[in-house]
Curated annotation (Swiss-Prot):
Family affiliation: Belongs to the prokaryotic AdoMetDC family. Type 1 subfamily.
Classification of source organism: Archaea, Methanobacteriati, Methanobacteriota, Archaeoglobi, Archaeoglobales
Name listed for the protein in its UniProt record: S-adenosylmethionine decarboxylase proenzyme
Cofactor(s) in the UniProt record: pyruvate
Organism: Archaeoglobus fulgidus (strain ATCC 49558 / DSM 4304 / JCM 9628 / NBRC 100126 / VC-16)
Gene Ontology MF terms in the entry: adenosylmethionine decarboxylase activity
């Protein structure tokens, strides 16, 4: 029995201007959540000094979290959805389109 799908990803070579500021990261994450048809319950973002962002979106299906290191061009993503497993795949694809990493690695876990 699979109750959900969980993608854990590291994106490398992401442009600094996409991941240094909370406003930009928030905009991208919120757009992905919306376009992937996930049900947002709430969100919290933290801007680090001098740069870098952590954010988490609580969704009815589970959660989306992001951590950025602009100085390394690095984004760590965690996307977990219960129910329709296609939504996690759609969200991940959208993140790749938005962040345009030079490379990435990811792990897909079927939960349950």
């Amino acid at each position: 029995m699979i109750v959900g799908r969980h993608i854990i990803a590291e994106l490398y070579g992401v442009k600094e201007e996409l991941i240094a500021k909370e406003e930009v990261v928030r905009s991208i994450v919120e757009e992905v959540v919306d376009k992937a048809e996930l049900t947002k319950v709430g969100s919290v973002y933290k801007q680090f000094n001098p740069h870098g962002v952590t954010g988490i979106v609580l969704i009815a299906e589970s959660h989306v979290s992001i951590h950025t290191w602009p100085e390394y061009g690095l984004v760590n993503l965690d996307i977990f959805t219960c129910g329709d497993t296609s939504k996690v795949e759609k969200a991940f694809k959208l993140f790749l389109e938005k962040f345009k990493p030079e490379s990435y690695r990811h792990y897909v876990l079927d939960r349950g």
